[in-house]
Amino acid sequence: ITVWALLKIKKHGLAYISCRKNHMAHGCCHDLRIDETSTYSEEELSLYSIGNLHVGKFGGTLNTLGTGIDAAERTSMLQQDFVIDNRDRAIKKLKWLSTAPSQLTFHFAYEAYLKGKEGENWLRNSKELADSKELCDECIMQMKKIKRQYKEIMNAGIADSEYELGLLGVIAWDAGQLNFLSRACMEQGYINKDECMICLDAAFKM
């Protein structure tokens, strides 16, 4: 999580995440890229737009199934940020993101944060993390990041409570990344629409 990523979600609210028509009509999305001819339903937009934090970061279109990110920038982003340059790598990455342990990282880090001083010991003694020292270490690192940034997040008005921080974190992290990458990989031709939809459903369930 980054403080300013969460702030952007908080600032634009559902307009940033969903870009729903009623928000657009009231001018909430004036600084965001939207397709005014989009005819997607509320249900479809709710499913497609979980990854819009990432889409907005790269100047994409928020209320479409595709990301709308410039092709050259999308290619560069996939290669440099995610080491995805073909179908096999795309499938491997998306499978990892859509199944444990990847999607558990924020959950464990956040739960450990709520446990205060006992958080790190709780992670190290977790049966679910016992088979992966790498994942356990990642959760500990992210827990410490939440601790460092919590006051700044509260002072900036990004979250009003620990509960709200937890909700924003899922969107900014696990579910958002899976949604975003599946849409980008579909546009890139690495996966087809049916495969993309499987990933979007998995992200939505997170």
Region annotations inferred by a language model:
Residues 2-180, 184-197, 202-206:
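Polar/charged low-complexity regulatory segments
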